[in-house]
Amino acid sequence: RDLGSRFPGSKEMVDIALRNAINKGYIVGPRMLVATFGIGATGGHFDPTGGYRDMIFGREPDWSDGIADGPDAIRKAVRFEVKNGADVIKAAVSGGVFSLADEVDVPQFTPAEMAALVDETHRLRKKVAVHCHGDSAGKEAIEAGVDSIEHGSFLKPETLTLMKNKGTYLTPTLMPVEYIMSKIDSYPAPVQAKARAAATAREEMFRNAVKLGVKMSFGTDAGVFPHGQNAKEFKLMVDLGMPAIDALKTATGNAADLFGIAQKVGTLEKGKLADVIAMPGDPTSDITATERVSFVMKEGKIIRNGPPSASPVAEAGETLTEIPGD
């Protein structure tokens, strides 16, 4: 699941183009569910001007950039993205760590806007995921019926209990804050302050979520840290009290359930797609084995059998439309 692509000043939805190219067999790649632009409020976390004057962006961003104010504009933004091929809708309903113009715990949607976001997305039979760190915004989003909360750093036990009761998924994304904290002095002062607060809060939040039995899915916010390190999220989950088998389920059966595709993927069962990975070692006893994947099969086709250099694409030295040996 790719939860957003944004190139300031451009309306190109490159994630849709990439997904379509993979699905048509033009290039080799993973099965993708994409969100296109994230939807957010003027001056909020997804506002591409980032708190600067609009001349930096070239113009004032609008609903076609994902920036929408008021229920009607939000519905229009949802329709625009679905029209262009979005599989899932992503919105930012609280401030963020990297956005300079907002506080991380301040709600950015009104209750009416939140209701419009959820209603329109579900009416079009799509799932809605929301970026949310703050507790009050999280509670409003859960009550409105969002399908998942991304991050949830400051969610209190009462709000996590509400998630449990409503069946809302939490995607904790522990790795980004871990990475930011490893180089905290390189960021602007406002980012440092928010990152430190989130780093402290997320550990207690995650432990509470595990204890309460909140449903969780795997996500990393990759891009905040270099791609290719996604599997490190598993160890962070386990280190904070989640059993290894449950951590693995967040990226398999749980994820498929959240996405509404559990009838096709998520578990190895007769009648489902043959999506398989393998690694040396037992990840239930050493979760870091997930960082050493040596075999990848997609729909019964071998994509990798050996270290990364053994990938059919890497061996060929060029992009292929078919896996050798088919």
Residue ranges and their predicted role:
Residues 32, 85, 89, 121, ...:
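Divalent metal-coordination and catalytic microenvironments
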Residues 123-127, 187-190, 198-283, 302:
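His/Asp/Glu-enriched, well-ordered alpha-helical/loop segment
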